[in-house]
């Protein structure tokens, strides 16, 4: 039985949330990756000896095909006339539909390995991280890859024989978002030319280039870089597409001459992902998931003219004016297509289906190729089935592949019989059906243990909620040192349950951390049930402290309203507008709670109503913002005015020391400096002049000093006043919301801070009106409302300026001012810092609210812990692993954020103590000392 000591509970809570946050990956997203399969060759008679895979990173399908108006020349033109001519006369084309996340690593893995990397792979990152599964490159005789150091190494280092893959890369310093992007692609074309030139004097290289099963991979990052920097409707983005098209035309001519027009070359041009209008990708927006696919050369069909059926064109592609049939594929299908064209084994982990519309071959050849494709998928199912059988006490195989007359062997025999009879089309249909069942069978095996694990996780979360509530009652309500008797039968039941669950995991050969899914539920509920008498006493005390004449009815009503608010917050994760409704209702709170006080303290009440109305507007604004230096500077000016006004006010009110005033003015000047450097950076970047070193260094110095200078206040004695402490904190984070914003985020920061300060004053006035000095520290059921307000404000701190999609589609405009060269981890760290600032502000305000109300330290935080995981449980069941990848990614993000916020509230408690250390409140003098 665990102790419910506050510090121990917090420690256990951290471990529990970290362990159970990972539960969705153990349940919904167990990696489908398996090893040990036999390889199956795509075709014994490959139509091509060599293949060129050209990936225009970040190229949208519409920009590749439609006529656009160039923003510089004003002329309407096709950006890729050579590729367009191929589509019209020599190629099969279509749209390749990608999956989320629409990022470079998963996109290239799908293209080259035919495998949709499981979502848990995001923990791997992509730089220098090898793919641990088979790929087209791995099956080739030799692959020449040229391009970005972010993509090439992962395929080379993940190959069985690394000497099989050449990776020719530029340095990371090439990826400077503030400079021209074309030089990235020029590097690729120039170095490919060098390879062919060297072969004239290098017999070994020449023989290698002329061998069969050779793959050339050109990763062209320029389009993506231009799109991030200047948007996909900019001259830079358009010019980069034109540059690529021109150089592909030159390359095709050079290759044909080198190989003496032997017609043994196949070409595939596509993109790993698209690009949204605001210059980002990552989510499931159609502009991100629709990419061009053009294939031509040996083994590829010629275009089919479009007649009455419009050639499969829809409203999206009709404007491209391409009178040929459009053939869409899933991104993973491209790996199967490439394998067929040069006669490679299908990658053993591929789930792609050979797109026969692209294949120029006899019906028998197609039938055999698609049969081999089905065999490769069936091989995965058989290996997976054997693994699952060995870990189950009772195993039930997948019915469509095990029922009489439908076994895999019987289905394959039927396919072979159809081919032998010359019924090629029927055999293709049968092979495609088998592939479908193999994929759904893999899904069946993946989800075999879902019910058991989800039940354990649910019981665990309810157990944690019960433990948090029990700990709160014992620490702040009962406050009794009276020992309680341990129930030995209950302890025995707990041990037996734990032994059974752990034994089951051992039999299944589950990872060691799975045992935590058994330990936490058993330990939590045993601890709570052992203290059931104390819990009942605590609830009784709270009921007696209730101001309601019918405490039971009031408790039911409060619980109901609390659940409504929590469910509204859940809804707000999908529709931010609900937070505006909540703020609208919050304007009524002072009048409903205590009309007399609301009327008497009308200035504070009016300020509350006004700020609620203003805050409600932020969650109605678009989360995708366009850079506006005017709004950035206006919000900075507002911070400046507030800083000056309150510095003067506090100087008069508190007679601040000269040193304190000097430090405050230094903080104000840092806001001014940040505004200046931000303006200089934006103007230079907008003019395409790159980031001036002076502005970059100045921006970094201003940002870092803004976080360091506040500590100078602790050298004096003035910083103990809570009003001064709030001003110090406000000015400390002000520069962050200047240099790391692109639009109205600075206004949100000011308003968020203001409403928290007003809330502190209003809560204090309400409490002063209903308590005596003797009962001031007593917690009542009504205090749970403050905990809910705190939790609600923590959600506003995040959703006030964005949502999940706005993080995945984070605009790089602001980080360019500090980091112009592509560095995803540093850029991501700056983003996370800006996101966390409102939580730090909330933490400080909550610490001061604790002091002003005179309630025990940590009481409000403890109450928040009792309710926060209700959100987590909601999102646990809202996680999906099928449907659109936008839904899948959103579900994962929501669950992790909800669980992370519960975890983060524990961190905020410590941060609160640090931020308000030494603060004193008058007339009820309390003090928090920094607890190390």
UniProtKB/Swiss-Prot annotation:
Cytoplasmic side: 1-8, 478-486, 531-551, 599-603, 649-653, 718-737, 808-828, 881-900
Residues linked to a glycan: 138, 202, 360
Record-annotated membrane-spanning stretches: 9-29, 457-477, 487-507, 510-530, 552-572, 578-598, 604-624, 628-648, 654-674, 697-717, 738-758, 787-807, 829-849, 860-880, 901-921
Lineage: Eukaryota, Fungi, Dikarya, Ascomycota, Saccharomycotina
Pathway connected to this protein: Glycolipid biosynthesis; glycosylphosphatidylinositol-anchor biosynthesis
Keywords: Cell wall biogenesis/degradation, Endoplasmic reticulum, Glycoprotein, GPI-anchor biosynthesis, Membrane, Transferase, Transmembrane, Transmembrane helix
Compartments where located: Endoplasmic reticulum membrane
Membrane topology listed for this record: Multi-pass membrane protein
Domain of life the protein comes from: Eukaryota
Biological role stated in the UniProt entry: Ethanolamine phosphate transferase involved in glycosylphosphatidylinositol-anchor biosynthesis. Transfers ethanolamine phosphate to the first alpha-1,4-linked mannose of the glycosylphosphatidylinositol precursor of GPI-anchor.
Cellular component per GO, a single term: endoplasmic reticulum membrane
GO molecular function: mannose-ethanolamine phosphotransferase activity
Protein name per UniProt: GPI ethanolamine phosphate transferase 1
């Amino acid at each position: 039985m665990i102790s419910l000591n506050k510090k121990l509970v917090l420690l256990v809570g951290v471990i529990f949330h970290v362990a159970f946050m990972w539960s969705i990956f153990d349940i919904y997203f167990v990696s489908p990756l398996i090893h040990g399969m036999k390889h199956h060759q795509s075709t014994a008679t490959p139509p091509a000896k060599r293949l060129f895979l050209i990936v225009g990173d970040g190229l949208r399908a519409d920009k590749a095909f439609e006529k656009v108006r160039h923003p510089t020349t004003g002329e309407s033109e096709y950006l890729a006339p050579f590729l367009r001519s191929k589509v019209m006369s020599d190629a099969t084309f279509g749209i390749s539909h990608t999956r989320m996340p629409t990022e470079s690593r998963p996109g290239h893995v799908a293209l080259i390995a035919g495998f949709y990397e499981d979502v848990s792979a995001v923990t791997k990152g992509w730089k220098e991280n090898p793919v641990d599964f088979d790929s087209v490159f791995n099956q080739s005789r030799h692959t020449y890859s040229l391009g970005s150091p972010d993509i090439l190494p992962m395929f080379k280092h993940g190959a069985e024989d690394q000497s099989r893959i050449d990776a020719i890369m530029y340095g990371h310093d090439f990826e400077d978002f503030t400079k021209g992007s074309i030089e990235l692609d020029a590097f690729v074309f120039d170095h490919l030319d060098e390879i062919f030139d060297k072969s004239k004097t290098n017999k070994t290289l020449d023989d290698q280039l002329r061998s069969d099963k050779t793959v050339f991979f050109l990763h062209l990052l320029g389009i993506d870089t231009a799109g991030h920097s200047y948007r996909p409707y900019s001259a830079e983005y358009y010019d980069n597409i034109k540059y690529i098209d021109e150089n592909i035309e030159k390359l095709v001519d050079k290759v044909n001459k080198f190989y003496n027009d032997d017609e043994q070359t196949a070409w595939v041009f596509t993109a790993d992902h698209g690009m949204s209008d605001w210059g980002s990708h990552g989510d499931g927006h159609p502009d991100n998931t629709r990419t061009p696919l053009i294939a031509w050369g040996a083994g590829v069909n010629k275009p089919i003219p479009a007649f009455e059926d419009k050639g499969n064109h829809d409203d999206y592609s009709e404007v491209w004016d391409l009178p040929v049939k459009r053939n869409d594929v899933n991104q993973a299908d491209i790996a199967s297509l490439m394998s067929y064209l040069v006669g490679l084994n299908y990658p053993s982990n591929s789930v792609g289906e050979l797109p026969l519309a692209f294949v120029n071959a006899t019906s028998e050849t197609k039938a055999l190729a698609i049969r081999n494709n089905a065999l490769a998928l069936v091989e995965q199912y058989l290996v997976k089935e054997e693994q699952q059988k060995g870990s189950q006490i009772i195993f039930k195989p997948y019915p469509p592949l095990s029922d009489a007359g439908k076994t895999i062997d019987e289905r394959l025999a039927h396919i072979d019989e159809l081919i032998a009879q010359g019924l090629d089309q029927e055999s293709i249909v049968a092979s495609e059906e088998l592939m479908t069942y193999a994929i759904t069978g893999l899904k069946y095996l993946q989800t075999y243990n879902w019910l058991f694990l989800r039940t354990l996780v649910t019981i665990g979360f309810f157990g944690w909620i019960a433990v948090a509530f029990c700990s709160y009652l014992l620490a702040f309500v009962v406050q009794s040192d009276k020992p309680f008797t341990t129930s030995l039968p209950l302890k025995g039941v707990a041990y037996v349950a734990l032994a059974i669950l752990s034994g089951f995991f051992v039999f299944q050969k589950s990872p060691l951390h799975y045992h935590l899914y058994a330990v936490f539920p058993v330990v939590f509920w045993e601890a709570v049930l052992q203290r059931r008498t104390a819990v009942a006493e605590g609830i009784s005390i709270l009921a007696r402290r209730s101001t309601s004449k019918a405490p039971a009815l009031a408790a039911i009503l409060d619980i109901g309203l609390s659940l409504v608010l929590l469910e509204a917050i859940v809804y707000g994760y999908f529709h931010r507008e609900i937070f505006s409704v909540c703020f609208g209702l919050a304007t009524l709170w002072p009048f409903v709670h205590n009309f007399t006080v609301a009327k008497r303290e009308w200035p504070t009440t009016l300020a509350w109503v006004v700020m609620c109305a203003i805050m409600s507007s932020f969650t109605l604004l678009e989360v995708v913002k366009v850079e506006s230096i005017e709004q950035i500077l206006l919000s900075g000016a507002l911070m400046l005015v507030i800083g000056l006004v309150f510095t003067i006010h506090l100087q008069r009110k508190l007679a601040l020391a000269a040193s304190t005033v000097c430090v405050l003015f230094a903080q104000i000047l840092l806001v001014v400096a940040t505004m200046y450097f931000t303006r200089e950076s934006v103007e230079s970047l907008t003019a395409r002049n790159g980031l001036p070193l002076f502005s970059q260094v100045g921006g970094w110095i201003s940002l870092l000093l803004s976080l360091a200078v506040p500590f100078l206040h602790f050298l004096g004695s003035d910083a103990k006043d809570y009003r001064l402490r709030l001003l110090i904190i406000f000015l400390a984070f002000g520069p962050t919301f200047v240099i790391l914003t692109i639009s109205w985020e600075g206004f949100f920061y000011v308003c968020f801070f203001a409403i928290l300060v007003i809330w502190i004053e209003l809560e204090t006035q309400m409490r002063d009106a209903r308590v005596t000095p003797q009962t001031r520290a007593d917690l009542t059921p009504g205090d749970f409302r403050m905990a809910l307000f705190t939790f609600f404000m923590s959600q506003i701190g995040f959703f006030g300026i964005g949502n999940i999609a706005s993080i995945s589609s984070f605009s790089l405009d602001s980080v360019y001012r500090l980091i112009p060269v592509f560095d995803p981890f540093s850029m991501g760290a700056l983003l996370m810092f800006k996101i966390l600032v409102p939580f730090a502000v909330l933490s400080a305000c909550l610490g001061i609210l604790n002091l002003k109300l005179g309630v025990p330290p940590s009481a409000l935080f403890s109450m928040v812990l009792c309710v926060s995981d209700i959100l987590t449980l909601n999102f646990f069941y809202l996680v999906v692993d099928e449907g659109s990848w936008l839904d899948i990614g959103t579900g994962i993000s929501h669950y992790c954020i909800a669980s992370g916020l519960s975890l983060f509230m524990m961190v905020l408690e410590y941060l609160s103590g640090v931020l308000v250390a030494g603060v004193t409140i008058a007339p009820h003098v309390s003090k928090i000392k920094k607890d190390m």
